[in-house]
Amino acid sequence: MKKIENFNILICNTPNIENAKLIAHNLVKEKLAACVNLFNGMTSIYEWEGNIEEETEVTMLIKSKSEFLNLIEERIIELHPYDTPEIIELKVVSSNTKYFEWMNGVLKN
């Protein structure tokens, strides 16, 4: 394992697989994300406007660099149907060396 800085995993939920794929393809094509994992059929329970809601969503794990956070946020907001899309950043502290090198090689310089 290699200690790394400035890499992150972003979590974002979307209402359906089509929207998740649209966002994922755009982020990878634009080299803002090295990889996006899609978890279909996740159940989200949350409060919205005073009501407890339960929805089936698609969770995206977006693997990227911290420096792209604002650009990724802009793209998600542009392509996402929710008024308030969830975008949460988790810092990556270490990674398999070869995976890190691959990620670094496919992302924008």
Task: State what each model feature region is.
Residues 1-109:
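Positively charged, small/polar-rich N-terminal and surface patches that mediate targeting and assembly
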